[in-house]
């Protein structure tokens, strides 16, 4: 019995079960901890682990981000970097508070205060971490290595102290101020939001609003008119009309006037067919062209004789259309007005709520008013619009904001008090109609901002807030952004760069409860003003003479002291009630997670900015942005050097994955069914890692494809090795000398793949690295192993057979380490099975390569291309590979200019543990001469003949009469550069008036008119005249097969079929690959009999058969299998 040095493997393993064994092995042997501890702290690779909330389970987006982080962390660890992977938790803010409110059955500020701030915050402290153990299970199962025991939480005292330190730094630099401004406000959360929070994900979504056109009666007429005049203004927020204090018009807009001149009474009706409110003359009630008119209210109004309506001329067509549609008499005054004719005029307030407001109810010119939307007259409520606020502020009009924190009208709007603003639109419109100020109502669909936590529509509200003066250092942020390597590259100047250009000052205060408190104390007496800002616990303990164990409310609110600037000693320093926007905490992660500057000062300053960060692409307006703001303001530095902005995982319909749609499988179910390596590879190999999206169906078919096309080929090569090595009792070694051409090629091809994977991973391109790995195993399985199978099958264990085993063993030794970041579990399984030196592949270093022969690789790759082209012809015409053919001809002419578009390259590599981000390796181009081509073919002709299964190989150094070159224009590219010339170029191509001048350019035209087109504006295609032909190697040449069959070729093909059937029967009988057998064939087919008689020796050799007999009785001890034309019987030779 030969010794077995490797585990017995099966051809189709349960990858999920194998993975669970590996994860258990890692945990029991502390492999992750060892991989970190063995690296020097002086050689760190730093990446920031963006903190998720632990009050919900991980979804596929979290898994994707985790896979990317883990892949590059493993890669850098293998480059001998120390990569600590502290997990972080986002604990504060709206997500935590909203979850706690729901669980406690309370809602809103009043109920929280009644419940008790201390009790509420203590509940938040517990509930925010309730899914942390579940997170740990998911993260561990996805084979992601993180440190859960040394994690950071934004609610930790140390983290919060660093946050208040950062704020004090900003304050001392003059980058913090308090101001009343109009800000996005979530009435559902009772807190303001920052501008960038309104740009997160799908914050903007479709909303149908009642848009109303309102007539404002002027108290002073323009000089041109003596009749009563009204300005028409259009708004999508009728609920803001009670707070109207001004009207705005455009400086460059031309206004017109229309007279409505007959006294007609109108009644309010609903046109059922149009689902729209309007007014019609009482004399015309009944049927109209639009449908049945149903009276819904008894309100009547009259248009006074000769009222003048004024609006932008661009609105005239809509005005007339509305009048004619509703039979409202009108007459165009043909009078044009300028903005100066209207500016300064006063008008009658719509309502009396704020009638006496100083400087209000006048018409002002504003730069932001256009005639494109609406009427060219903008209703202005300074308490509810940013532009409104600044316009009124410039005219000394106060910002009136008569709503409470929950979005309900206060007592100032007496008849609507306590009603939510969005529920008052109908009542306000009704009142406008009764007063004669209403002109028209319509349903208006528009994109409107919603709260990112509650999905409720936001309002804009004037309120006090603390701001970071981002606009003061915005230009520096733009400069620092140029230093960052963004993936994809367009993010730098595109999505993120443009976001920086539009950056506003950042509202960082939230009038909430669970968060880091803003460390500002103010005097409670305006006569003795004083502001104190604290940046450490020590400062607080010094001034308030108390031990500070917790920085949360309400403890922090209880810290008061007499105002040192008040000689009376009566005024008290009290903290402002706000807490920080939780995004301020997220932006503090780089320094706060290590308690800088109170601890780890030297380490942080030596390892900032971070080497790497990744999140999904919308974080360009979220976390990436806040990191940039604080990093620039505090350290005058970019926060990270490399950033991957990945895309989003969607279902096959392009919808986000959600429980409501039931359009995704639980990740744990996917792990149990397919394993996590398959999902990992699917994500790392797709365009999603560079900003695209991944479409995933609930059945997981794309994950199943990875099992079939990636995992299984890798396993097959390993299974092949262990099965044959155990059968031969061989213990393979990592080899240094490669005797045969194919062995050398396979080792060098492995080196090339490893080097390319290293270059891709150093450039943060896992997609390319995955492709290289797939291509490599295609070569290993379908070229080397298949081409070498007879070496493994032969009975004697000679040096040639030993070399084949050693080559496979060596290839695994290198490629497994390179594949670790992409497939950490299957590589570990195979590594342990092959018993290399390290107990875990994750404790090994990335391969240090030897120099290799790139020219040999180029030659063999060319051979493979020729073979693949020939086999594609067989496939096209359904000619099985087992059927030998008479001949094939390779036509090649490297001296032809059109064949030099992409010459073969010989790469002289530069070896080092780390390949630079930009490849600086020297490349030399090699053009194949006719003589070299023929030498190459002669050297490899037996290999080609055997692979393609042809008897003769011919090489012809000419393409004349066989192929022609076709020029294909790239219309999109040409259309951008010379759109008016494209038609002419097409004509020149049809007439054949073109030639390639060099590898880059093509000349088109004649002596009188000509054009040069560049490489990216065209494509050259080699076209052949024979149907049994194929182009190979990017226009390098043509392969033509002779498909004619004579009797000898047919018999040989049948003999090969018999071999296949015998081997299939052997497999089904569960015989071992090395078992010697006896074979009986029963058939009445004369051609098969002749084939067996002619090729008997060949059949016996190929099937390890000691005997091969025809049409004798198959005994009971034989395993038999019936096929279409014959029966195969096989028996073990005992």
Curated annotation (Swiss-Prot):
Pfam families in alphabetical order: Anticodon_1, DUF5915, tRNA-synt_1
Taxonomic source organism: Wolbachia sp. subsp. Brugia malayi (strain TRS)
CDD domains: Anticodon_Ia_Ile_ABEc, IleRS_core
Job of this protein: Catalyzes the attachment of isoleucine to tRNA(Ile). As IleRS can inadvertently accommodate and process structurally similar amino acids such as valine, to avoid such errors it has two additional distinct tRNA(Ile)-dependent editing activities. One activity is designated as 'pretransfer' editing and involves the hydrolysis of activated Val-AMP. The other activity is designated 'posttransfer' editing and involves deacylation of mischarged Val-tRNA(Ile).
Gene transcribed to yield this protein: ileS
EC annotation from Swiss-Prot or TrEMBL: 6.1.1.5
SUPFAM superfamilies: Anticodon-binding domain of a subclass of class I aminoacyl-tRNA synthetases, Nucleotidylyl transferase, ValRS/IleRS/LeuRS editing domain
One function term, GO molecular function aspect: aminoacyl-tRNA deacylase activity
Chain positions recorded as ATP binding sites: 659
Gene Ontology annotations of biological process type: isoleucyl-tRNA aminoacylation
Identification of the protein by name: Isoleucine--tRNA ligase
Organism placement in taxonomy: Bacteria, Pseudomonadati, Pseudomonadota, Alphaproteobacteria, Rickettsiales
Domain comment, as recorded: IleRS has two distinct active sites: one for aminoacylation and one for editing. The misactivated valine is translocated from the active site to the editing site, which sterically excludes the correctly activated isoleucine. The single editing site contains two valyl binding pockets, one specific for each substrate (Val-AMP or Val-tRNA(Ile)).
Residue interval(s) of motif 'HIGH' region: 52-62
Stored PANTHER family: ISOLEUCINE--TRNA LIGASE, CYTOPLASMIC, SOLEUCYL-TRNA SYNTHETASE
